[in-house]
Every structure is written in C-alpha cells, then in structure tokens.
C-alpha cells in the first residue's frame, strides 16, 4: 500500500484525512477515543508525513490513493472525515467512487474555489535553514520571524525529521507542495452532483464556510447539511475535539 496509515479500534470503518501540512499524527487523540466504538484509519496523504513523495499532486490523485487504501483494507463503505484539504479529498472521493463510501464529513472546507492562503507559511518553511539546525528550538527561532503564532509553528514542526548525519529535513514534499499549491484551491467541478450523505462542519470563528456558501453546497451535495461548532476556528479538531466527536457520532 502506497499510503502510510494507522489503525485503531474495531467496528464500522472511519477514514480520517488531515489537511495541508498535516499528518495522521494530528488526529491520534481523536482516533484513540473513537477507536473505542469504530475501526479508525488515519492516513498520511501523498507528499505528507510518512507517505510517498510524488511530483504529481491534486485532489483527483489523492482521492485515487484513498480508493486504493479502501480496496487494500477491504473496507465496507467507510465514512470519510476530512479536514480542510482532506475535506476536498473526501468530496472528490464521493464523486469518483460513491458506491464505496457510506457518508462523508468535511471539516471546515466547502466545495468552492479558495484563494491560496499559504504563501507566508511556504516562504517560512523554505527559508528556514533546517539542514544545519542543531535543535528543534533553532528551527523554531527561525520560523518565528515569519510565523509569530507558537501553536502554528508547533503544528508545522511536527513535519521535522532529524537526519542521521545531523540537522533536519521536512517529512513533507515541500518543493512539490509549493509548486502545485494552486491545485489545492480549485473548486468542485460545476456539474458534479452526489447524493452521498454529507455533513459540512464549520468553526464559528472561521471564514472557510460562510452562510452564503449554502446554495453552492446544496447544489453539489443535495443530501447534506451544515453545522457550526461554536468557539472553533479552522482547526476544529484541535480547538473543540469533544464537540467535533459528538457531531460525528450524531451524523453516524
């Protein structure tokens, strides 16, 4: 299997897909908790975490990787939960192989076009001299010049891998992500309509899914609904994990 993945629990299967610059590690607390009632599979998407690097990067390709994971594990119509970029992968999956999926949950990501918001992060990651860094604190100090938010830096630094000869490297395929970043803003194709039951979960403090997006969402996903988790920003699973799990269980 090309994708790196982790499993926990037993029962009806749920696949969890992380967002841009994320890894399956970001969801392990939730995966462990939900593993008490379900079989949870958290995967590293291509060019992220411990999964393979490729010069090709886009939603159709990532959805194809997910389909191969479903086939490899012989999963019977899993629920797919995707955050941000992972939400778009879940949507694309529901278009490409709807018969293999029971439901999808898109966490703070709609089907519309999104302007690229990550230039600052990419510039910070590319400018950091991690190959010569002596410690994670050294990398943190470098990143802080462009990324003042401590939590954001700690999230990004989960991608650091120490080299045997000293210094660090990024687990993610930073060059390809930077080159193909525009692909991640693309909207769902205008004619795509899927009846897969779908939940769009948004954070009340995030602007990724707006009230005005409801018409577009229902156009592509007529069997869907939008719910808001109060007090959560874009990183819903980090801000309000208990409320997120409750919403997932209610939808199941």
Q: Where are the regions that the model predicts?
A:
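Conserved hydrolase catalytic core segment
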Residues: 76-117
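Conserved alpha/beta-hydrolase catalytic His-Asp/Glu region
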Residues: 116, 131-185
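Serine-hydrolase catalytic-loop signature spanning alpha/beta hydrolases and amidase-signature enzymes
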Residues: 21-29
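Active-site glycine-rich loops that stabilize anionic/oxyanionic intermediates
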Residues: 19-22, 84
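Conserved serine/cysteine hydrolase catalytic core
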Residues: 165-220, 225-228
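Alpha/beta-hydrolase fold catalytic core
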Residues: 1-15, 35-38, 75-76, 182, ...
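Active-site loop/oxyanion-hole signature of alpha/beta-hydrolase fold enzymes
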Residues: 28-35, 41-82, 246
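Catalytic active-site module of serine/aspartate enzymes centered on a nucleophile-bearing elbow/loop
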Residues: 224-252
